[in-house]
Amino acid sequence: MARQVSLEKTRNIGIMAHIDAGKTTTTERILYYTGVTHKIGEVHEGAATMDWMEQEQERGITITSAATTCFWGDHRVNIIDTPGHVDFTIEVERSLRVLDGAVAVFCSVGGVEPQSETVWRQADKYRVPRIAFINKMDRVGADFFRGVGMIRDRLKANPVPIQLPIGAEDTYRGVVDLVEMKAIIWDEESLGAKYHEAEIPADLAEMAQEYREKLIEEIATFDDALMEKYLGGEELTTDEIKAAVRKATIDIQICPVICGSAFKNKGVQNLLDSVVAYLPSPLDIPAITGIDAKSGEEITRKASDDEPFSALAFKIMTDPFVGQLCFFRVYSGVLNSGSYVYNSTKEKKERIGRLLKMHANKREEIKEVYAGDIAAAVGLKYTTTGDTLCPEDSPVVLESIEFPEPVIAIAIEPKTKADQEKLGISLQKLASEDPSFRVRTDEETGQTIISGMGELHLEIIVDRLMREFKVEANVGKPQVAYRETVTKKVKVEGKFVRQSGGRGQYGHVWIELEPQEAGKGYEFVDAIKGGVVPREYIPAVDKGIQEAMETGVLAGYPTVDFKVALVDGSYHEVDSSEMAFKIAGSMAFKEAAAKAGPVLLEPIMSVEVVVPEEYMGDVIGDLNSRRGRIMGMEGRAGAQVVSAMVPLAQMFGYATDLRSATQGRATYTMTFDHYEQVPKSVSEEIVAKVKG
């Protein structure tokens, strides 16, 4: 079976936005118009095709990014729907990593909201070309131009409208296409599914001319040949303008802006036309680079079926019918179902059982998958998110995906003995699906501790345990992931000697411990001269310190951001062993940390509250009482936006408190920002509580 769709006609796109800007609705409409769904799923009826986990349908938010294939004309469009809630940024990161382009959906009333900024920064990091779709143009307070201004000011992007709205709010009835200079009017009877072209309305003619000039000036700056024609007063053809907009978009010089109302079926076809016209195919983006697993040198893989196979796994999902599904993006070559691949990240051989093309929650079995495509495989045992798949004879490791450290933890315990076994297995499954979720056992209490990116994140995980895995569990109160660090430089000795009958033990070291700047982590330096500690025992000292630093001296939290130099020591010909030096290392660390002015660190969250003017004072007073620092305030669409830095420990239950203080009219978002030293009085309380 040969390739059905050529590479230049393939688009891999993501749809990204703030919660409730209308992301899933937009995706639903795309699936409807491309003929994949016969009945449109409404998010607020809980029937959207893309939101297929029960929790998503209940909460009306998208949690897992479902990958779906659809056709528009002769183009294949693979869409990855990404969640907008900040607890799930990890999902957004991993989908952006494997996309070629994205559609950023903004609400015409709210404009650029805090989460939009986070997602936009992630897309900048992976250099993903974008189109902006200003949605909900039929809502009261809709303002297309304010939206464009906010994209410029808040996201520091270069938005260029290629459409203008005709009317707004309840009079929104069409758009002016600035590339072809014509009006597109929605047909009310067919729910906007049909539209007709018309002359540009007289009252908009002048404005349309002005914006078209702006569009041409903007794209001509990136294209010398166009600039010459334009300055010479020649008319540019539609094709020339389209080609120039495409080039500038792919080079991330501009971000074309279009508008519509997905819920009212308006403008979705134009959005699809723009995706095909302006977003890159796998051939338009640079060849992916990786490391040759044999030689360690950098190599590239071009988007071509003739190159060796290479793919990146970007999502693991448990499907009730086929078991574990692994979603992957093929960068080069061809993969057949039933064949063997090599997981170069884990250095394991894997067999591809079946290959599936996913459509939100239906699946179609395929025989092979080609360069530039996205598919799911069944039967992979070892592969997890961020792993590379390739042939064993030409192994490559593609750049992996980095995952943030979790900041909030809760203890979870099974209700019955029968639940105990299920709990362990279920948690491992969930952790393999979501790398920002961690599971560990507390050595002192024997409790199972799960940690994640926020309260909602953990709430949904506990919910899935009960529903999907049928595990009954009790959940403790959320705990903050504190850290410890040191503030002074010290030099100490660690000596472990045991000489009573039989073979003795002897390990002796001197270490220097000093603080490093925040975020630097742990560093070990071997500064031994003249072999006073033999080379083979040095890694054991390092290991001893690493084990000891997991439980800090103040309150048992992991110690971070310090440097240890092994400077001196001694050994015994017969009695020294790795074990003895490991114990000496850990003894030295414990003593050094206690003398080096240990302090507690706590996660500080960046909080943004959108609040009506009249509740502003209460909200600020409340944030101050939570040890918050107000960073700034600005007006936005009839409300005030307060940004603050607040310790996570003070933010538990904030959603409920904020709701009652503002009669449910304020909303907030919270993301982890950095770790900071805990004030002395608070620190003493925490230590006293731990030592009890």
Swiss-Prot record:
GO terms for biological process: ribosome disassembly. It comes from the Bacteria. It is found in: Cytoplasm. One of its GO terms (cellular component) is cytoplasm. This is Elongation factor G 2. Residues 8-283 form the tr-type G domain. The keyword ATP-binding does not apply. It holds the Pfam family EFG_C. It comes from Geobacter sulfurreducens (strain ATCC 51573 / DSM 12127 / PCA).
